[in-house]
């Protein structure tokens, strides 16, 4: 049997299988530090996410809202609204290092809109971020720096700037301090101006800055002259519906809308109120042209030599219709319009009847707010019941109330060949076809141009004639109506014009709110003395701007109307008598 020798096992290398105490502790510390670093990174990341998404204690959404907001420009590219770099001042109360009482006093001096107690409370609070002044001026920023308080910060915040100041302020509207559009085209165009697809490109309005300035200047002069509480004016392209000017006085500066006193008197709204579309008025005798168009279109007027009895006031039930300046005679169609006879117009409306009168007004849109991009469009005052007297009185603008833009749209259709096109504040592409609704025939439209021209050459609008510009128009004066009650000493005066009448291109409407008579007007305050001069001034200034050069060799043909004009008949009779006497002497 063989013997087996068992060798002893080799000794274990302890240096390779055991960890020294020093190495073990270092490894443990490294792991702990790594975990702490990861945890801190996570906490910081979560905090940043919170600040970016949920926190509102720092600068608000103003900068985010503006971003690449596009400019608003006029039809010729003149900038009306733009975004510029602005700076707001703010403070972080927990970071204040100076004397808080002294700082509160200094802040109250520098920002006096709030009392010193307010700033004491802010500085003692735990609020992390408080605005001191939004859109601060350079002088205010410099003064804040001199306080030497590092807790006061300058926060970059782009702001909306209106380089033309108060011009077209009711059309443009304004933005609030947080960068949110409040009114006007700023509100209507908000999505387009800020969309990624628009990429900050400007949006062109139909407004012509030159025309707008002329309208505002003329209105301002007349408001001051006649101590009126306000005025409104519109210049409308009769073929495209583009509004070249829309003015409302008083005005406000879109750069500082907060400085506008809030109006409390319903008869005297504040400056942010757009009288051209928000106010609805009884527009008086300007409605006579509309009634005549209806009568011609429906065959009630076929013979312009037909005479109507205006020898005495017209009694209808308990109502008595009279003329302001009675002629006390039988009157032809041109005579009724030239002398603005309520009696003659009421008799024509009586032949039209209730149904056709109401239907024509509805066709013109007088029963609903006017169509336009702006909000706050006034609701017309429509008769609750159409009686015979309603038909007669609405024929000369009494008992129905519409906005100035309603009237401008209607007259555009009367003179442009009979088509009503929607009004717009956006520039249309040159030569673009603008669909519309036929209101009257081209033949009727021609007759309306003749009648409007006669009013200016022979009638109540005679002082509005400008050589070579061939203006036509109609005056209108009415008492203000508040809650169904007429304010006898408060007049609204209107002159609506179109030019040139041989080929109309523009309608101009001027409305004066409560003008007062003056020595120069012999105490009179009706449309011929108040609204008409402003419209005449506007047309004289904008005609050449718009390429309409005075030309006395052109005019609309009135030869078939003049024989029915009383003054022309008298002139012809006087001429014939002179010729007869000359022959007798011979």
Language model features with spans:
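Small/polar-residue-rich segments within soluble enzyme cores
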Residues: 91, 95, 102-110, 118-201, ...
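Short beta->alpha transition motifs characteristic of CBS
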Residues: 67, 82-88, 92, 174-178, ...
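Beta-lactam-recognizing serine transpeptidase/beta-lactamase-like catalytic domain environment
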Residues: 2-14, 81, 233, 238-285, ...
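Conserved, well-ordered alpha-helix/loop/beta-strand core segments that scaffold catalytic motifs
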Residues: 129, 193-231
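Short, basic/aromatic recognition patches
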Residues: 45, 53-64, 211-226
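Hydrophobic alpha-helical transmembrane signal-anchor segments
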Residues: 5-6, 20-55
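Second-shell loop/turn segments in exported
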Residues: 59-63, 88-96, 104-107, 126-134, ...
């Amino acid at each position: 049997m063989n013997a087996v020798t068992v060798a002893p096992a080799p000794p274990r290398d302890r240096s390779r299988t055991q960890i020294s105490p020093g190495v073990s502790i270092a490894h443990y510390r490294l792991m702990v530090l790594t975990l702490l670093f990861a945890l801190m990174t996570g906490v910081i990341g979560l905090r940043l996410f919170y600040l970016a998404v949920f926190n509102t204690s720092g600068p608000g959404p103003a900068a985010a809202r503006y971003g690449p907001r596009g400019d608003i420009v006029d039809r010729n590219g003149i900038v009306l609204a733009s975004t510029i770099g602005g700076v707001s001042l703010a403070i972080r109360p927990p970071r204040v290092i100076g004397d808080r009482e002294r700082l509160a006093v200094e802040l109250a001096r520098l920002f006096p809109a709030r009392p010193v107690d307010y700033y004491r409370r802010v500085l003692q609070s735990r609020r992390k971020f408080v605005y001191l002044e939004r859109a601060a001026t350079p002088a205010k920023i410099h003064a804040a720096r001199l306080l030497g308080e590092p807790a006061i910060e300058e926060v970059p915040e782009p702001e909306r700037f209106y380089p033309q100041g108060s011009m077209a302020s009711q059309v443009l509207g304004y933005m609030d301090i947080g960068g949110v559009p409040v009114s006007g085209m700023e509100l209507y165009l908000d999505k387009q101006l800020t969309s990624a697809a628009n990429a900050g490109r400007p949006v062109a309005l139909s407004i012509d800055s030159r025309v707008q300035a002329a309208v505002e200047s003329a209105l301002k002069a007349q408001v001051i002259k006649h101590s009126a509480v306000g005025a409104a004016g519109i210049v409308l392209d009769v073929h495209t519906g583009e509004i070249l000017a829309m003015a409302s006085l008083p005005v406000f500066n879109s750069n500082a809308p907060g400085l506008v006193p809030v109006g409390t008197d319903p008869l005297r709204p504040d400056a942010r109120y757009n009288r051209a579309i928000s106010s609805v008025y009884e527009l008086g005798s300007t409605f006579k042209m509309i009634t005549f168009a209806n009568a011609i279109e429906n065959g009630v007027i076929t013979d312009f030599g037909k005479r109507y009895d205006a020898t005495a006031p017209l009694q209808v039930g308990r109502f008595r219709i009279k003329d302001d300046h009675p002629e006390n005679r039988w009157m032809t169609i041109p005579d009724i319009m030239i002398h603005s006879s309520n009696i003659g117009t009421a008799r024509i409306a009586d032949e039209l009847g209730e149904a056709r009168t109401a239907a024509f007004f509805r066709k013109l849109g007088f029963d609903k707010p006017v169509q336009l991009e702006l909000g706050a469009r006034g609701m017309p005052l429509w008769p609750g019941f159409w009686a015979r007297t309603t038909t007669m009185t609405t024929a000369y603008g009494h008992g129905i109330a519409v906005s100035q833009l309603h009237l401008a749209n209607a007259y555009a259709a009367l003179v442009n060949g009979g088509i009503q096109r929607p009004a717009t504040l956006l520039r249309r592409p040159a030569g673009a076809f603008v669909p519309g609704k036929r209101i009257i025939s081209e033949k009727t439209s021609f007759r309306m141009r003749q009648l409007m021209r006669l009013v200016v050459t022979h009638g109540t609008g005679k002082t509005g004639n400008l050589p070579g510009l061939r203006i036509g128009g109609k005056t209108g004066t009415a008492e203000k109506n508040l809650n169904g009650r007429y304010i006898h000493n408060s007049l609204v005066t209107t002159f609506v014009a179109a030019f040139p009448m041989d080929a109309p291109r523009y309608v101009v409407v001027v409305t004066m709110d409560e003008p007062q008579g003056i020595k120069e007007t012999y105490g009179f305050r009706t449309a011929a003395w108040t609204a008409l001069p402003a419209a005449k001034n506007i047309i004289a200034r904008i005609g050449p701007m718009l390429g309409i050069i005075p030309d006395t060799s052109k005019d609309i043909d009135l030869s078939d109307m003049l024989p029915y004009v009383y003054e022309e008949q008298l002139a012809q009779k006087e001429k014939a008598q002179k010729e007869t006497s000359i022959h007798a002497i011979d």
